[in-house]
């Protein structure tokens, strides 16, 4: 490697670039192309090393300086401290020039964790939403298993088996079912995780920092957490049916009517508890400070509360439908309504599971729609220029400021160009943290791109140019509790200096936020690093396509020019990409709810065999019976969809004004979309209808004599 123009890279990277051993790479730099000879391959024997080395070329430092045009310059120095860290750190700090920063590895790791903390919490919340819906499904399944054996349990009680033994028996069965189900769930979760990896890494790349995650890493802690969640949720979900099985006397446990009468009494008590849960959820949402976890917990309390309230509301709706429309429905028309009410111990839970999934879907859709509208309006306002140039390149290069300035002057002199603005993306040390900073040289029209979250002072632009002042973006202000008039200490080449905050600007480009400074102000305290972008404002009537083509001829290397419309389109595509993972997990919750409705209807088929046999015996045809069951399932879906609308509104409101503001520091307007509500009702209705097709066919095929046969 001490020989000039030699390099090492991983074998997989070499294969991707079609470079053999001792072959040559051609590096495109700002000035020209530089050849490098690959003299060896780096070992990438495991997933971690493969990801680290995926896009890495290692050379001798002299080769790197020559190729990049940075002779005699370093971008970083890594120091391993032996002992007395604080004393050594202070000594090193005293030696540093104004443009150098001393950062610990621990602080950088903590910064990366903080950047993705809110994103990670929200992903976990979506996963727990699926778990909540699954909890209703587990309750449904275990209740079905208990009800299926009511006669057996009654017989065992008559033979002397105690309540405690019955309770232990049911819990033991649930334990083994939970163990099998959790193991299968973990295996499927690993497969699903591999599929979602690209979606998640794409979102992180778009919002936070660049990662190249291609291999899923599974730790024992993650497997243990999955096992604990699966077993715990099953345990809590099985307690109500287990207690129900032991509560009744041996004689009463033999009668189905005892179950429904007991369920109705329980539903009334649960209705009161659900009110407490909903009120607690709303209180937690708006009285819990800035905690993201409490904000998410409030949504779960609200959803769980409305889920418990669903059977009560279902009974009221069934009474209303029968009372208002009963005279028009006829006998067969009233039967589905009464069947939903009569089997409320089964139908209520299925409707609740479907309602929770659909309300979460409505809430997420309303939130995403509101966010989309807000971002679209922000993009339209924040892209006032007609054309934008991206000027990538190493800011350490001595020639960059001069070449960027020359390019700016050439563009300004082109026919059709009215004015230009410039931007520099850099990082400054603010309050001890490395902070993104955008340095603007504003044209008059550039000022239209700012959306302030406060009444703007007329002197703001003059102060931004001539005084040590900054504008902060809304996320930065939220996360750092910054208000107008406060000062932020920045490390300059002349030492630490307080910059007054004179504005808070709306920004949705990232959730960490950044500082905004005038170029004139910046050059007083820091060295010139050139530009990272130039905005071009065309004269009225100018041919933008022709102007874009002429500017392209002035560009070199990786410099590009794009219209504001192209940037808007790419930004909105990026926005949609960031919510792909949300969409996938949301549909997973809906699928779980669909399985819940299907299992409830299959359970009803078993329990109502004799009842349906009687209907067949008194003259109802197979076709009428199928229609009857389909009407019942459609009614269940319709009820779930109608109840999901107000719950979805509450979920959307908490997501927009509590969870997302605390997570990302953004504020956005609430946009109502009637199409989302209609889609929610249709989703619930169609899901219930599809779930009822197979049970309806099986029930219709049941022979009356077989259905009425008893022991």
Regions found by a protein language model. Name each.
Residues 1-711:
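Alpha-helical transmembrane segments of bacterial inner-membrane membrane proteins
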């Amino acid at each position: 490697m001490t020989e000039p123009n030699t390099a090492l890279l991983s074998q997989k990277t070499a294969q991707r670039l079609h470079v053999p051993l001792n072959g040559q790479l051609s590096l495109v730099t700002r000035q020209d192309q530089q050849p490098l000879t690959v003299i060896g391959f780096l070992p990438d024997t495991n997933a971690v090393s493969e990801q680290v080395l995926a896009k890495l070329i290692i050379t001798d430092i002299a080769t790197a300086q020559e190729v990049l045009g940075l002779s005699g310059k370093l971008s970083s120095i890594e120091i391993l401290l032996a002992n007395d860290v604080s004393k050594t750190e202070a000594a090193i700090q005293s030696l540093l020039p104004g443009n150098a920063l001393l950062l610990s590895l621990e602080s950088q790791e903590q910064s990366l964790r903080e950047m993705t903390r809110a994103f990670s919490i929200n992903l976990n919340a979506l996963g727990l939403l699926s778990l909540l819906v699954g909890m209703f499904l587990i309750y449904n399944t275990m209740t079905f298993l208990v009800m299926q054996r009511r006669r057996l349990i009654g017989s065992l009680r008559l033979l002397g088996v105690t309540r405690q033994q019955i309770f232990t028996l049911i819990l033991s069965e649930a334990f083994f079912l939970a163990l099998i189900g959790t193991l299968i769930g973990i295996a499927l979760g690993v497969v699903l995780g591999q599929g979602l990896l690209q979606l998640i890494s794409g979102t992180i790349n778009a919002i936070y920092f660049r990662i190249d995650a291609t291999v899923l890493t599974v730790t024992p802690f993650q497997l243990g957490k999955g096992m604990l969640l699966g077993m715990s949720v099953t345990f809590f979900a099985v307690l109500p049916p287990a207690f129900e099985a032991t509560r009744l006397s041996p004689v009463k446990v033999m009668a189905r009517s005892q179950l429904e009468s007991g369920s109705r009494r329980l539903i009334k008590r649960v209705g009161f508890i659900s009110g407490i849960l909903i009120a607690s959820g709303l209180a937690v949402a708006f009285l819990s400070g800035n905690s993201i976890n409490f904000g998410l917990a409030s949504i779960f309390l609200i959803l769980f509360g409305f889920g418990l309230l669903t059977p009560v509301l279902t009974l009221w709706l069934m009474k209303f439908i029968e009372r208002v429309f009963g005279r028009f429905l006829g006998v067969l028309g009233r039967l589905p309504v009464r069947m939903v009410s009569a089997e409320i111990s089964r139908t209520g839970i299925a409707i609740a599971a479907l309602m929770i999934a659909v309300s979460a879907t409505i809430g997420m859709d309303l939130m995403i729609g509101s966010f989309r509208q807000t971002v679209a309006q922000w993009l339209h306002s924040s892209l006032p220029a007609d054309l934008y140039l991206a000027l990538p390149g190493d800011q350490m290069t001595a020639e960059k400021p001069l070449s960027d300035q020359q390019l700016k002057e050439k563009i300004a002199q082109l026919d059709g160009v009215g004015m230009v603005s410039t931007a520099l993306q850099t990082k400054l040390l603010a309050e001890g943290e490395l902070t993104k900073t955008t340095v603007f040289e504003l044209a008059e029209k550039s000022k239209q791109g700012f959306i302030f979250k406060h009444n703007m002072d007329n002197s703001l632009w003059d102060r931004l140019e001539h005084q040590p002042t900054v504008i902060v973006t809304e996320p930065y202000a939220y996360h750092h509790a910054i208000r107008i008039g406060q000062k932020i200490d920045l490390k300059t080449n002349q030492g630490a200096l307080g910059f007054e905050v004179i504005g808070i600007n709306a920004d949705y480009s990232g959730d960490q936020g950044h500082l905004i400074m005038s170029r004139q102000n910046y050059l007083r305290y820091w060295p010139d690093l050139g530009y990272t972008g130039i905005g071009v404002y065309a004269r009225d009537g100018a041919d933008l396509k022709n102007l874009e083509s002429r500017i392209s001829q002035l560009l070199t290397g990786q410099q590009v020019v794009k219209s504001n419309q192209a940037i808007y389109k790419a930004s909105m595509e990026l926005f949609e990409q960031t919510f792909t993972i949300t969409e996938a997990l949301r549909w997973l919750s809906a699928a779980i709810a669909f399985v819940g409705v299907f299992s409830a209807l299959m359970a009803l088929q078993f329990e109502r065999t004799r009842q349906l046999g009687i209907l067949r015996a008194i003259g109802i045809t197979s076709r009428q019976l199928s229609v009857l069951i389909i009407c019942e399932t459609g009614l269940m879906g319709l009820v779930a969809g109608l109840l999901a609308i107000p719950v979805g509104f509450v979920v959307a409101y908490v997501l927009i004004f509590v969870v997302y503001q605390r997570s990302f520091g953004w504020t956005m307007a609430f946009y109502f979309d009637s199409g989302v509500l209609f889609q929610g009702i249709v989703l619930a209705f169609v899901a219930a209808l599809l779930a009822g097709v197979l049970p309806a066919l099986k029930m219709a095929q049941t022979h009356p004599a077989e259905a009425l046969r008893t022991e």
